Amino acid sequence: MGVLCFLASFWLALVGGAIADNAERYSANLSSHVEDFTPFPGTEFNFLGTTLQPPNLALPSNGSMHGYCPQQTKITTAFKYINTVISCTIFIVGMVGNATLLRIIYQNKCMRNGPNALIASLALGDLIYVVIDLPINVFKLLAGRWPFDHNDFGVFLCKLFPFLQKSSVGITVLNLCALSVDRYRAVASWSRVQGIGIPLITAIEIVSIWILSFILAIPEAIGFVMVPFEYKGEQHRTCMLNATTKFMEFYQDVKDWWLFGFYFCMPLVCTAIFYTLMTCEMLNRRNGSLRIALSEHLKQRREVAKTVFCLVVIFALCWFPLHLSRILKKTVYDEMDKNRCELLSFLLLMDYIGINLATMNSCINPIALYFVSKKFKNCFQSCLCCCCHQSKSLMTSVPMNGTSIQWKNQEQNHNTERSSHKDSMN
C-alpha cells in the first residue's frame, strides 16, 4: 500500500509540474502541439507532427519546406485535458486491477497453473507500462516538452521510455500467442491430469517471452536520443528516433510495417490457427466413445478458451485504430500535397483516439476477466472487498483450468475440508 501511495504521489506531482510549466513556458505556441508525444511504443518524434522540426529538418532561409505546416494543427487545449483525465483513470484502474490480479494468482495456490501464469506475466507487463510510461506521456502532453530535458536524467528517460513501451507490447503479444497455443495443447492432451502448479514448459515460455521482448526493444533504446533544435527563435530539446547508422535508417523506414505485422497481426493469426485446430479436436471428440465421460472436462476447457479468445479480441479492438492511423500516415500522406495540413489534423485526432484505446488495453484485461470468468470474479470480490467479507465468509477461488472446489461457510462449519479435482490444462 505504501508503494501505491508513493506512485500516486509521484504521478500527481509530475502532472502538476507539467500543468504549471505549460502555463509559464508554452502557453503561446507549443501548448497546442503534441508532435513529440510518442503514440506507440517507440514512435519517432515526427510521426504526425510537422511543425516542430529537428535540426536536420530546419527550415531553409526562404521559409519553405516540404511537410511543414504554417498553421497549428486543430487540436484544442480542452482535448488535451480530456486526454489527461482518461490517462489518469487508466492509471488508477490499471494499477489496482493488474496488482490485484497478480496478488490473486500469487496468494492462491490453486490458481497457480499454466494459463494463469501466462495471465500473470501479461498483467505484470501491463503494470510496468501503466506505472512508468503513463506519467511521462501525460507530462509531455501538458507541458509540450520532454521531462528533465536539460539534464542526464532526461536522457536516461529518453532511452528507458521507448524501451519499456516496446517491451510491454511485446510481452502482451507473445503471452497472447502462448495462451492460444496452451488452449490447443490442453484440448489435444485431454487425458493428461496433473496436480496444482506451474508446468516447467510454461515457466520456460514466460522467461523466453520476457527475454525476447527485451531483445526486440533494444533498437528503441539505441536509436532514441535527446536532439536540440530551434523553433521560432527558441531552443528546445526533445526525445526522438535519430537514425545515425544504416541499420537504424532501415529500421526507421520499415518500422510501421514491422509493428503492424509482428505486434498486431501475429497474435491474431496465431489465435486463428490454433483455435481452428482446437475446434477440430473438439468436434472429433464429440463423436468418440468417451463423449459422456469427457463432456464436463471439455466444457470447463471450452470456458477457459473463451476467456483467452476474449482477451485477444479486446487486444485487436484496442490497437487497431492506432495501427490504422500509422498505416494511413505511411501510405496516404504526401508532403507535396497542398491539403496535407488538413489531413494531418485528421490523423492527429485519429491518433489521439488510437492512443487512448491502446493505452486502455493495459487496464482492461482484469476487467474482462472479472466479467468473463466466474473463478476470477470470485477472486476479485474476495480480494478487493476482503474487509467487508472477512467477518462473514471465507471465499475460496477456483483456478481457470477446471479445478472444482467445494466450500462451505466458515460460520456454519469450522471443520470444513476442501476437495480439489484438477483437470490439466497443459
Curated annotation (Swiss-Prot):
Gene Ontology CC: one annotated term: plasma membrane
GO molecular function annotations of the record: endothelin receptor activity
Cytoplasmic topology ranges: 103-112, 182-205, 279-306, 373-426
Protein name, as recorded: Endothelin-1 receptor
Residues with glycosylation annotation: 29, 62
Organism: Rattus norvegicus (Rat)
Functional summary from the UniProt entry: Receptor for endothelin-1. Mediates its action by association with G proteins that activate a phosphatidylinositol-calcium second messenger system. The rank order of binding affinities for ET-A is: ET1 > ET2 >> ET3.
Tissue-level expression: Predominantly expressed in vascular smooth muscle cells of a variety of issues, bronchial smooth muscle cells, myocardium, and the pituitary gland.
N-terminal signal peptide: 1-20
Intervals, Extracellular compartment: 21-80, 133-159, 230-256, 329-347
Keyword vocabulary terms for this entry: Cell membrane, Disulfide bond, G-protein coupled receptor, Glycoprotein, Membrane, Phosphoprotein, Receptor, Signal, Transducer, Transmembrane, Transmembrane helix
Protein location: Cell membrane
Quaternary structure, from the entry: Interacts with HDAC7 and KAT5.
GO biological process: one example: mesenchymal cell apoptotic process
Parts of the chain that traverse the membrane: 81-102, 113-132, 160-181, 206-229, 257-278, 307-328, 348-372
Record-listed Phosphoserine modification sites: 424
Family membership noted in the UniProt record: Belongs to the G-protein coupled receptor 1 family. Endothelin receptor subfamily. EDNRA sub-subfamily.
Keyword Zinc part of the UniProt annotation: no
PROSITE patterns, alphabetized: G_PROTEIN_RECEP_F1_1, G_PROTEIN_RECEP_F1_2
Disulfide bridge positions per record: 158-239
Gene from which this protein is expressed: Ednra
Record keyword rRNA processing present: no
